[in-house]
Amino acid sequence: RNFMRTRKKKTAFESRFLELYPEFMAQAEEVTRRVCASSSYALHRQCIRERRVCHGDYSQHNLFFDREGAVAVNFARCCFDVQISDFYQFFRKIMEKQGWNQKLGMEMIHAYQEVRPLGDAEFENFCIRLAYPEKFWKLANHYFNSRKTWIPEKSLQKLEILDMQEKKRREFVKFLH
């Protein structure tokens, strides 16, 4: 952010990013406080101790379907973690594409719980993950790791789409509490 602020001639992406930054930073700080006050650390340590395996990149790109059901592929990011993290990744991407539709979100959560019921700590962990503005920080990371002399128009478009979806995402997160 300091790099962007000190630039005399800002790109449209940089100007828009700086406008949105305070809101998303406040959200990230609030989620950090929630994590510290929650049982997330203990849950994470327990999952590692119990060697609970997560895919690590669970998305529609790594799922194939045949007559017998779904098959997950590409386990390059496989790790020990809280298993709800795989569902969270899949869920967030679907919800972004579906405009954070509350009905769909609740149907997905209920379907997941029919197969693998969530305890209170896991559900809290899921809600905390959803509350974190991951997409904003992903765009920020992409910007800071790229050549800043030329920023693709697509980056600005993604930032604008994120801003438009943000209210719906926050409403859904609030609805879950």
Language model region names:
Residues 1-53:
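ATP-dependent phospho-/nucleotidyl transfer catalytic cores
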